[in-house]
C-alpha cells in the first residue's frame, strides 16, 4: 500500500457519518477495507470493527474509536489537511492503525479495533474487549500529535441530582425548589474547591455544573435537577466523590427529597513512561526524525477502561491536534498522519524484538 492509499483510507472513513451508537455503516466499511488489506476482519458482538493480521507469540492491540460527536463538517482536503468530523477524534488515529498494521511483522499478531460508543457514557466497545484476554501491548487511538505519546488521563464522574417536594403556592414563604438546588450545587462546588487547593491542570479536581432545570411542577410535586460533572486526577476515587455528593446534597437540599444517580464513571488512568511500549515509541519517533514527548490529558478515553482491566503496557497515540476535538474546525495534517503511520510501523517492529 502507498501513502495515497492510506490517505484514501482515512478520507473514506471520515466521509461516513458515525455518530455514537450509529456506527454501523462505518464499521461495515472499515471491515471491508481491512479484509482487502489481508486482515481477518469481522464485526464483534458489541458492534466493533475488528481486524487481525499476522501470527506470533506477541500480541498487540491497536484500539481506536470509530464513533464521533455530532456536527456535520463537509469533508474535503485543503492545503494538505483533511477537514471533517472525526478526522482528528479519532478516525485519523484509527486509520493510521490499520495502515501501519497492514505491513506484517514476523512473530507479532496485531488486532485493530474500531470501537463503538467511546463518545457515549457506555464505552460499550472497549468494555466488551476488556473482557477478553489481555494482549502484551495496547495502544489507544487518540490524537497526541505524531511525535508525542499520552500516558495519563483524568477520570470522570457524571451525576444527575434530582430534588422533589410537595407543590406549594407561589406566595408561600421559604426558598423555591430551584433555590434549594442552587444551594446543593454551591455546597458541591465549594467542597470540590477544597479538595485540591492551588493545584493546576492535571492535578486539579475539576467540577462543573453541566446543566440545570428547575421549577417544574405538575400541581402536586415540584422538581429541580442538576447535572454535575467531575474530571478527576489520580488519587481520588469516583465512589468516594459520589458518596461525598450524596451527603452534601441531602444536607443542603432543605426539605426536598434528594436522589443522586451516577450517569457515568471512569477511574483515572496512568501508565509509566518506562515500559517497553513507551520506550518503543521513543525509539520509533526518533527514527522518524522527532524527539518524543509525553502528555497527560484532562479528558478521558478508552484507556481509562482498558488499562486497569488488562494491566499490560498501555499508551494512547495518534496523529492530530487534540485542540480540534469536537470543534467546527476539526482537521488533520496529512503529513503528520503519514509520519504517525511510520512511527507505528516502528513500534510494531520493536514488538517483534522487545527492548
Give residue ranges: language-model regions.
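Acidic/histidine-rich catalytic neighborhood of metal-dependent amide-processing enzymes
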Residues: 95-156, 162
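Metal-dependent amide/peptide-bond hydrolase catalytic core
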Residues: 143, 157-355
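Active-site metal-coordination/substrate-binding segment of hydrolases
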Residues: 57-114, 128, 328
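Acidic/His- and Gly-rich active-site-bordering loop/insert found
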Residues: 1-87, 303, 311, 321
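Short beta-strand/turn micro-motifs at beta-sheet edges
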Residues: 72-73, 147-151, 213-219
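Short glycine-aspartate micro-motif
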Residues: 61, 82, 136-140, 158-160, ...
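Short, surface-exposed alpha-helical segments at coil->helix boundaries
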Residues: 7, 24-28, 94, 242-246, ...
